[in-house]
Amino acid sequence: MSKDKRNTIKVVDCQVLAHYKFEGDQYILTLSSEVIALETKPGQFVHITVSDALSMRRPISIMSVDIENGTFDLLYKVVGKGTRQLSERKVGDVLSVIGPIGNGFELTNKKIPLLIGGGVGMPPMIAIAQQMKDTDHDPFVILGSEVPFPFTPELSKMGNPCPKASHTMPQLEEWNVACRLASLQDYEGVFKGYVTDLARVYL
């Protein structure tokens, strides 16, 4: 790791501002940190202390940031003891966080990037879509999940490039970023198949 990259990594005590549970043991955690919100690049992650009883930090991708309010969001799924203890943290709790970590994504000259992510691969795609929303990159996002999505899919009011899918992630719709959803489950408005199958339909 270069000295420049080390200098951007901080150890910060972050307060839990919100902690929402979704079906499939999925959670969205909102933490306060002006420095992490300001310095995060899409595709980066943090190492987070989940409880005083477990010294080993857990790596979790950053899903979105709010620079104005100095906060950032993490999406995670309970898969073991560490994430189970993290899921028990309450609003007002303070967690030790190291980050942002990783190289992150660099924007390219591609006019219409296709961003594809499923499961734990969704947060980095949402993060880069957030960065692109105020540029001329005009991304199209495909998100997939085999458990219920960690948000309530809604009918998109944007143009539909994929006739077999009509629903989107509300946050991306709010950002005016085109998105469609894929799953092997029978969810309303969601393409039935893998994200790669939906990508072929789009292309």
PLM feature spans:
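Ferredoxin-reductase
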Residues: S2-V91, V147
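FNR/FR-type flavoprotein reductase catalytic core
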Residues: K81-L203
